[in-house]
A protein has these predicted regions:
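Conserved beta-strand-loop-alpha-helix junction that forms the acyl-donor binding cleft
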Residues: 155-164
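Conserved catalytic-core motifs of GNAT/GCN5-like acyltransferases
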Residues: 174-188
Length: 238
């Protein structure tokens, strides 16, 4: 006898949802007020990325690669990255300088589940703690939910990486826990902290970003009046 298709009223199950897959990420160009995101191209971006990233070796402390001894080894690494579809790599252009100043990727791509992760984020010192850096995260989240059609957007990091954990909360990701002994990176143990944002949360997160970016949220010196973390209501828990 085949199992019944009927489910007992006493047995809790998930709600039924549309099973159409999400789109896969690919080449794109998204222009913001402070930053532009475009597909990583070693010919266009290698030189300015190297100049942006070469002096701060701490950028690579929690990564599975880097730091790089010279521009040649960095360029070889970029060449290897751009042939991959997962992760799919993008360059971050600082509109103020028109120079590539960082890299982000979309990775762990599962279209059937409509789940995707943002990761491998490397911002040069000139991009860190700027409105451009925050705008990149807004533009990527908007693209993931509104263009690609994902229902879950993930952020994962080494559990020891306190700045990344703070950034995830500030941006509106919810802390979900730690996977112990999850990976071995550069010969060292990595416990991984997991964060997520889901499609039902995105309208409120989007509104928080847009309120934060509003000109009236910054004084004449450029200092924020209300923090993005406060607007998101996620200032603890990870």
């Amino acid at each position: 006898m085949s199992p019944s298709s009927e489910v007992s009223a006493e047995q809790p199950i998930g709600s039924q949802i549309d099973t159409a897959p999400a789109e896969r990420p690919g080449p794109m160009r998204i222009e913001g007020r402070y930053a532009r995101i475009e597909a990583l191209d070693p010919v266009m971006h290698a030189d300015t990325l190297w100049r942006s990233l070469k002096d701060d070796t701490s950028l690579w402390a929690y990564m599975g690669y880097g730091p790089f001894a010279d521009e040649r080894s960095f360029a070889v690494w970029l060449d290897e990255r751009v042939i991959l579809l997962d992760p799919f790599s993008y360059a971050v252009i600082d509109i103020a300088t028109r120079q590539a100043a960082g890299i982000v990727t979309l990775m762990e791509i599962r279209p059937a589940m409509r789940v995707i992760e943002i990761g491998n984020i490397v911002y040069g010192p000139s991009l860190q703690r700027t409105r451009a850096a925050t705008e990149v995260q807004y533009l990527m989240a908007r693209h993931v939910f509104e263009k690609l059609g994902h229902r879950r957007y993930e952020w994962k990091c080494n559990a020891l990486n306190a700045p990344s954990r703070r950034a995830a909360l500030r941006l509106g990701f919810a802390f979900e826990g730690v996977f112990r002994q999850h990976m071995i990176i550069k010969g060292r143990n990595r416990d991984t902290a997991w964060f997520s944002m889901i499609d039902g949360e995105w309208p409120a997160r989007k509104a928080a970003f847009e309120r934060w970016f509003a000109p009236e949220n910054f004084d004449e010196t450029g200092r924020q009046r209300v923090s993005l973390a406060s607007l998101n209501g996620l200032v603890s828990g990870g």
